[in-house]
Swiss-Prot record:
Annotated family: Belongs to the IPP isomerase type 2 family.
Species of the source: Latilactobacillus sakei subsp. sakei (strain 23K) (Lactobacillus sakei subsp. sakei)
UniProt keyword Repressor, yes or no: no
Gene name linked to the record: fni
Protein name: Isopentenyl-diphosphate delta-isomerase
Function recorded in the entry: Involved in the biosynthesis of isoprenoids. Catalyzes the 1,3-allylic rearrangement of the homoallylic substrate isopentenyl (IPP) to its allylic isomer, dimethylallyl diphosphate (DMAPP).
Length: 349
């Protein structure tokens, strides 16, 4: 039997997974290490008193973290999406798909994304497309997985370094059109380069109310795309962007009006709690969960993520925080580098 030739787009999806795992580092340092909670010896509560649930677009998520957009678009990534959907179902986590643009261009790849709904029929699923797509593409992406919400990713740095990437970035008006007309909530997200206050203000101006600031510190798409280039020409951009912590600082002035989500460089439950303390309503995790899945399989990954939920509850109990609102008042100190960033950007915590 002759196997059908894999498309360029499908091959790229497989390359992304391979390179994300190749460059994954469990012990990688990032700006979450520059945040320290002040220990509270008398929290005056029980662990059972702590509520870790959060609200998103009128729905309650029992966990304050979710599986962020990763993959799909090839037979290999179909298997990964099926396993991730199993993990999401067992652990009770919302889950985002990877970019579905490839399946909208090539309908033979639809099942590499729709498999998520097959394996998690009652779960909260977020569809995913790139900025620059119009309303009809957004509607097709949502229908493909019967999604509860849509992520639109903005990824100029990745596109510039990607050999076959886009070279025109007139995105804002189309984002606004989708937000105004789509039947499900829309999240606009970065892909690991962070967001500035200026970017957040522009998104707010066209009606965006949900933003994932997705900063550097984890999966690095400049490094991944540069590795795919023959000339390796953009290695000097490997540190481009704002960290997730810096991006949460940038979002401070908008947090009462917008729902801010955080992702990028999340390694453990303490990182999640720190992001929630800085104002994130929920925290997305991609690379760390993919690494767990590849190394241990779906059952052990789900068990680990259930353990993370219990550990988040325990950390909040140590801090005397009964819920996420109380957590945002927990005393915290910053490293000199983070304090310098706040000063240079005229921001406050």
């Amino acid at each position: 039997m002759v196997r059908p030739k894999q498309s360029i787009q499908s091959h790229r999806k497989d390359e992304h997974v391979f390179l994300a795992e190749k460059f994954h580092q469990d012990d990688r340092q990032n700006d979450f290490d520059g945040l320290r909670f002040i220990h509270q010896s008398l929290p005056e509560l029980a662990i059972a008193d702590v509520d870790i649930s959060t609200q998103f677009a009128g729905t309650t998520w029992q966990s304050p973290f979710y599986i962020n957009g990763m993959t799909g678009g090839s037979q290999q990534t179909k298997k990964l999406n099926a396993q991730l959907a199993q993990v999401a179902q067992i652990a009770g986590l919302p889950m985002a798909t990877g970019s579905q643009s490839v399946a909208i261009k090539d309908p033979t790849l639809v099942d590499t994304f729709s498999v998520i709904r097959e394996f998690n029929p009652a779960g909260f699923i977020l569809a995913n497309i790139g900025a620059g797509n119009d309303l009809s593409v957004a509607q097709k992406a949502v229908a493909m997985t019967q999604a509860n919400a849509l992520e639109i990713h903005v990824n100029t740095a990745q596109e510039v370094v990607m050999p076959e990437g886009d070279r025109e970035f007139y995105w804002l008006d189309q984002i606004g059109e989708i937000v105004a007309n789509l039947d499900v909530p829309v999240i606009v997200k970065e892909v690991g380069f962070g967001m500035s206050a200026e970017t957040i203000a522009k998104l707010q101006s066209v009606g965006v109310t949900n933003i994932d600031v997705s900063g550097k510190g984890g999966t690095n798409f400049v490094t991944i795309e540069n590795e795919r280039r023959r000339d390796k020409a953009y290695d000097y951009l490997s540190d481009w962007g704002q960290s997730t912590v810096e991006s949460l600082f940038e979002s401070q002035a908008f947090q009462t009006e917008l729902t801010i989500l955080a992702s990028g460089g999340i390694r453990n439950p303490l990182d999640i709690v720190k992001a929630l303390r800085l104002g994130a309503s929920a925290v997305g995790i991609s690379g760390q969960i993919l690494h767990m899945l590849i190394k241990t399989g779906p059952t052990e990954t789900a068990e680990q993520l259930l353990a993370w939920q219990a550990q988040i509850q325990s950390i909040m109990a140590i801090l005397g925080a009964r819920n996420l609102t109380a957590l945002q008042s927990a005393p915290m100190i910053l490293s000199p580098n983070l304090r310098h960033y706040l000063n240079e950007r005229h921001l406050s915590l």
